[in-house]
Amino acid sequence: MEEIEESPPTSEELVPCKICGRSFFPKVLKKHVPICQKTAAKRRKVFDSGRQRAEGTEISTVKPIKPKLQSSSSSSKSDKPEPPKKQSNWRRKHEEFIATIRAAKSINQVIKDGGPLPPPPPPSYDPDYIQCPYCQRRFGENAADRHIKFCKEQASRISNKSKLAGGDKTKPPARTQYKPPAPKKANSPTASSVSSRLPQRSAYGQGAGTGIPSSKPSSTGSIKSTPSGYSPLRNNSSSLTSPPSEGNMKPKGMVSQSSLRNPSTGIGMNKKKIQNADNCISRNDMKNENDFNYSTTGTKFCHECGTKYPVESAKFCCECGVKRMYI
């Protein structure tokens, strides 16, 4: 690359600008003079950050910062009178300070002696502060102007809410001594409706009350007894749609009133059941007369309150808590 030879410095003299006083070359000065005249004619305003921050708020006491000029400062001082200075309350503040010190010393002495504490000194208020007529608090001049407007709006809102609350009906008192309802008993309407569909306890079964389940009722509504040494026949266990009631719990060997009225039908059904039982009963069932072979099929309804079991594996009733019966 070829080296660029530096030109020797020119011997032109610098000419000062008449407006700003800076010195330029004659060629550059021709361009600078019109620009310098425009800038001198248009003075830039001093940026006031306080006024920008106060825009959009309730603060209107921000004063713009004025540029201080030596020529204008002397004339402004002579024209505008100074605002009167506030009288200092140094004597009053001094007396309050001495009173607080004396009160603190007296309290320390009483604590050492073990006597009763004296009452606290009365509160002192600054007379320069302005008291709010709504909340009775005191603020400075600038703060009081902002606070009183806000406090007035808040007080009007609270008064409107109290009027609306007073016009409404009084609320009922809270039930602090609330007790949950007792669980349903056997004599509830649901249990009575379920038990009405089932065969009632016979006269003989009510007197005995042994609690041993007998054979299932037939389609005619009569309950048959089984011979000694045989377990009751249980057919169509899956077709059980209604819960067994206490009326089904009959002692062995007891006959209902309906079967006594119709002896012919009862005898015929007993013969059929005995024949079926001879085919199904094993030798292990013949050992003890009181042994019953219960299967694992559970009832679909609770025998106490008639509520249907929600799950097949439920062992207790979800309504009354009675243990589930198995057939």
From Swiss-Prot:
Superkingdom of this protein's organism: Eukaryota
Database matches in Gene3D superfamilies: Classic Zinc Finger (3.30.160.60)
Cofactor(s) recorded in Swiss-Prot or TrEMBL: Zn(2+)
Region listing for Disordered, in residue ranges: 40-96, 108-131, 154-271
Biased composition (Basic and acidic residues): 46-56
Biased composition range(s): Polar residues: 187-199, 233-245, 255-267
Residues annotated to bind Zn(2+) 2: 132, 135, 147, 151
Keywords per UniProt: Metal-binding, Repeat, Zinc, Zinc-finger
Protein name in the entry: Zinc finger C2HC domain-containing protein 1A
UniProt lineage: Eukaryota, Metazoa, Chordata, Craniata, Vertebrata
Residues given in the record as Zn(2+) 1 binding sites: 17, 20, 32, 36
C2HC/C3H-type zinc finger span: 13-42, 128-157
Bias-annotated ranges (Pro residues): 116-125
Organism of origin: Danio rerio (Zebrafish)
Family in the record: Belongs to the ZC2HC1 family.
Low complexity compositional bias, start-end: 63-76, 211-229
GO terms for MF: zinc ion binding
